[in-house]
């Protein structure tokens, strides 16, 4: 009986691995129609008896402002071009910070955030962390860095029910994602740690200060020229 259950478990695991690889390969070329986080937000609204309309319009790489691309990297993951999905230094710093108590600091890279938003549910269980690591590794192996950032910008939450750069630009500033200014992009990047509480359109003093920091980091990174590094970053042969 135990041997039978073990064989079934191994077979299920193999099917999951094959299926997840095929899904990640497909999404390298096909825009994701939605995300697990969007489904979760919709279910939450039904449970709370407060239905929301999800706003999201996919925009390809060339129709998103370079200002926003650089701002997000500057604010969220400055080692994005170099790492393979995990920032070990940031993880170690977060562990030390969290051991000292107080607020919990995260250390998620853009690649990890893509895997969470696309495929997983909210929470901090070991199972979820393991699946996050698995999908992050697959994304880094099979997607170029530019694709990872493109999917991130089209999937990340920027307010209650507002997902992706185009919806965020329209919602907060009344412009398209292609026309976001440096100031607007820095404000959108500044609220990403807590987009359902902080507002890019009505920024608090803290958000304004953080946006100023993001702009300084953008300048230090080299502005739009920094995006050229995405084409020169470390990638596996399969991501070429």
UniProtKB/Swiss-Prot annotation:
Transmembrane segments annotated in the record for this chain: 12-31
Membrane topology of the entry: Single-pass membrane protein
Role played: Peptidoglycan polymerase that catalyzes glycan chain elongation from lipid-linked precursors.
Enzyme class: transferase
GO biological process, one term: cell wall organization
Compartment(s): Cell inner membrane
MF-aspect GO terms: pentosyltransferase activity; peptidoglycan glycosyltransferase activity
PANTHER family, per database record: BIOSYNTHETIC PEPTIDOGLYCAN TRANSGLYCOSYLASE, MONOFUNCTIONAL BIOSYNTHETIC PEPTIDOGLYCAN TRANSGLYCOSYLASE
Catalytic activity, as annotated: [GlcNAc-(1->4)-Mur2Ac(oyl-L-Ala-gamma-D-Glu-L-Lys-D-Ala-D-Ala)](n)-di-trans,octa-cis-undecaprenyl diphosphate + beta-D-GlcNAc-(1->4)-Mur2Ac(oyl-L-Ala-gamma-D-Glu-L-Lys-D-Ala-D-Ala)-di-trans,octa-cis-undecaprenyl diphosphate = [GlcNAc-(1->4)-Mur2Ac(oyl-L-Ala-gamma-D-Glu-L-Lys-D-Ala-D-Ala)](n+1)-di-trans,octa-cis-undecaprenyl diphosphate + di-trans,octa-cis-undecaprenyl diphosphate + H(+)
Entry GO terms, CC: peptidoglycan-based cell wall; plasma membrane
Family to which the UniProt record says this protein belongs: Belongs to the glycosyltransferase 51 family.
Keywords recorded for this protein, A-Z: Cell inner membrane, Cell membrane, Cell shape, Cell wall biogenesis/degradation, Glycosyltransferase, Membrane, Peptidoglycan synthesis, Transferase, Transmembrane, Transmembrane helix
Any one Pfam family match given in the protein's UniProt record, by short name: Transgly
Entry superkingdom: Bacteria
EC number assigned by the record: 2.4.99.28
Keyword Glycosyltransferase set for record: yes
UniProt protein name: Biosynthetic peptidoglycan transglycosylase
Listed pathway(s): Cell wall biogenesis; peptidoglycan biosynthesis
